[in-house]
From Swiss-Prot:
This is 8-amino-7-oxononanoate synthase. It is an enzyme of class 2 (transferase). One of its GO terms (molecular function) is 8-amino-7-oxononanoate synthase activity. The keyword Acyltransferase applies. The lineage of its organism: Bacteria, Bacillati, Actinomycetota, Actinomycetes, Mycobacteriales. It comes from Mycolicibacterium vanbaalenii (strain DSM 7251 / JCM 13017 / BCRC 16820 / KCTC 9966 / NRRL B-24157 / PYR-1). Keywords: Acyltransferase, Biotin biosynthesis, Pyridoxal phosphate, Transferase. The modification N6-(pyridoxal phosphate)lysine is found at K235. Catalyzes the decarboxylative condensation of pimeloyl-[acyl-carrier protein] and L-alanine to produce 8-amino-7-oxononanoate (AON), [acyl-carrier protein], and carbon dioxide. Its cofactor is pyridoxal 5'-phosphate. The keyword Hydrolase does not apply. Pyridoxal 5'-phosphate binds at G104, Y105, S175, D200, E201, A202, H203, T232, L233, S234, K235. InterPro entries: Aminotrans_II_pyridoxalP_BS (IPR001917), Aminotransferase_I/II_large (IPR004839), AON_synthase_class-II (IPR050087), PyrdxlP-dep_Trfase (IPR015424), PyrdxlP-dep_Trfase_major (IPR015421), PyrdxlP-dep_Trfase_small (IPR015422).
Length: 380
C-alpha cells in the first residue's frame, strides 16, 4: 500500500535537498541600476533597452494608451500601435504579416499548437528552446525529437510518417551554444515532403542577416510561403513581447485559434512602443548587428574559445555545476555579471559561463571584461 503523506508539499524539501547537493539550486538576484556593473549576461544584444529613443517610445505609448492593454487583443487590448508595429516589423524581415503576443514564449506556444495538433507530426531539434519543447508537448501531435542539427534524421522522420500534415520546429540560433541551424537544408527537406517549417529567430533577429533582419534573411528564406518565423521583442529590441510572422493566412488562423493570443491580455502599450522605437533605431543604425558579432569574437578570444562565434553568445564550458557557479560568482565579485548555465538547461558535464556581447560595449568595458575574465579563467 502506498504511504500517503499528511503534508502535500513535504516532498519539496526532499527535492530541494537533492538539487542543492547537485549544485543546481537557483536563486533570484536583483539587478542593480544601469552602470553599477558590467553586463555580459543579458540578452540586450544591441544595447537598446537603455537607448533614449527606446525609452521615449515606451513613455509616449504609456501616456497615450495607458499602463496596460486592459484585455485580450480580441476585446480591448488591441491598439493602432500594435498593428503599426506589426506592419513595420513584417516589412523589415520580409514577411507578409505579423501578430504580436505577450511574450516570445507564448508566441511559440500559440504558433506551434495552432499549426499542428492531433493527427499531425511535429519534428523538433533536440536543442530547441524550452518554449518550443512545451509547445510540442501541448500540441497533442506525435512528436519526434531529432539529434541536434541532424537534417538526415529530420528527412527520415518526414519521409516515413503516416500523418498528412507535418511541422518541423527549430531555433535559428541556439541559445546555449550560439550555433546556427542548417535552415536551407531543413527547408529543402520540408519542401520535399510537404512540411511546414517554424523557425524561432529569438537570437537571430538584430544580429544575423542584412542589417539584423535575421538568419532567414541571410540564407535567402525570408518570406517563404511554407515557413513561419517567431521571435521575441526582449532581446535585440530591448523590450518584451513576442511575434509570429508569416503568410496572412497564418495570422488569421492564429487570431481564431491560438489560445495564448485569445485568452491572454494583450502586450502592454509601453512594451510595444519601446520595441517599435528599437526597431526604428535598428533600421537607422544597421551597423549595430555587425558590432555585436565583432564584440563576441573578442570575448571568445579572451576566453580561449577557439571557434569564432556565430551570434552574440559565447559559451565557456567548465564542466561541473559548482565550477561554473564559482566562476560566475568570481566575475560578479569583480564587477562583471556573466550567465551561468547548468543542467537541466544544458547537458550534464557541460555547465558553462554564457557570455553575451552587446553592440553598445565601450572600449573601457571591453578592457574590464578582458582583465576580469583572464583573472577568473586562467589557468583553467
Amino acid at each position: 500500500m502506498t504511504r500517503v503523506s499528511l503534508s502535500p508539499l513535504a516532498w519539496l524539501d526532499e527535492v530541494e535537498t537533492q538539487r542543492r547537493a547537485a549544485g543546481l539550486r537557483r536563486t533570484v538576484r536583483t539587478r542593480p541600476p544601469v552602470g553599477a556593473e558590467l553586463d555580459l549576461a543579458s540578452n540586450d544584444y544591441l544595447g537598446l533597452s537603455q537607448h533614449p529613443r527606446v525609452i521615449d517610445g515606451g513613455v509616449s505609448a504609456l501616456r497615450t494608451w495607458g499602463a496596460g492593454s486592459t484585455g485580450s487583443r480580441l476585446v480591448t487590448g488591441n491598439t493602432e500601435l500594435h498593428e503599426a508595429f506589426e506592419d513595420v516589423l513584417a516589412a523589415f524581415v520580409g514577411a507578409e504579416s505579423a501578430l504580436v503576443f505577450s511574450s516570445g514564449y507564448t508566441a511559440n506556444l500559440g504558433a506551434v499548437v495552432a499549426l499542428s495538433g492531433p493527427g499531425s507530426l511535429l519534428v523538433s531539434d533536440a536543442n530547441t528552446h524550452a518554449s518550443l519543447v512545451d509547445a510540442c508537448r501541448l500540441s497533442r501531435a506525435r512528436v519526434v525529437v531529432t539529434p541536434h542539427n541532424d537534417t538526415a534524421a529530420v528527412e527520415q522522420a518526414l519521409a516515413t510518417r503516416s500523418e498528412a500534415r507535418a511541422v518541423v520546429v527549430t531555433d535559428s540560433v541556439f541559445s546555449a551554444d550560439g550555433d546556427l541551424a542548417p535552415l536551407r537544408a531543413l527547408h529543402t527537406a520540408c519542401r520535399k515532403h510537404g512540411a511546414l517549417l517554424i523557425v524561432d529567430e529569438a537570437h537571430g533577429l538584430g544580429v544575423r542577416g542584412d542589417g539584423g533582419r535575421g538568419l532567414l534573411d541571410e540564407v535567402g528564406l525570408a518570406g517563404a510561403p511554407d515557413l513561419v518565423m517567431t521571435t521575441t521583442l526582449s532581446k535585440a529590441l530591448g523590450s518584451q513581447g513576442g511575434v509570429v510572422l508569416g503568410p496572412a493566412a497564418v495570422r488569421a488562423h492564429l487570431i481564431d485559434t491560438a489560445r495564448p493570443f485569445i485568452f491572454d491580455t494583450g502586450l502592454a502599450p509601453a512594451a510595444v512602443g519601446a520595441a517599435f522605437a528599437a526597431l526604428q533605431v535598428l533600421i537607422d543604425e544597421p551597423w549595430r548587428a555587425q558590432r555585436v558579432l565583432d564584440h563576441a569574437a573578442t570575448l571568445a578570444s579572451i576566453c580561449d574559445v577557439t571557434e569564432v562565434p556565430s551570434s552574440a553568445v559565447v559559451s565557456v564550458i567548465l564542466g561541473e555545476p559548482e565550477v561554473a557557479f564559482a566562476a560566475a560568482a568570481a566575475c560578479l565579485d569583480r564587477g562583471v555579471r556573466v550567465g551561468c548555465f547548468r543542467p537541466p538547461t544544458v547537458p550534464a558535464g557541460t555547465s558553462r559561463l554564457r557570455l553575451t556581447a552587446r553592440a553598445s560595449l565601450s572600449e573601457d568595458e571591453m578592457t574590464l571584461a578582458r582583465r576580469v575574465l583572464t583573472e577568473v579563467l586562467s589557468p583553467r
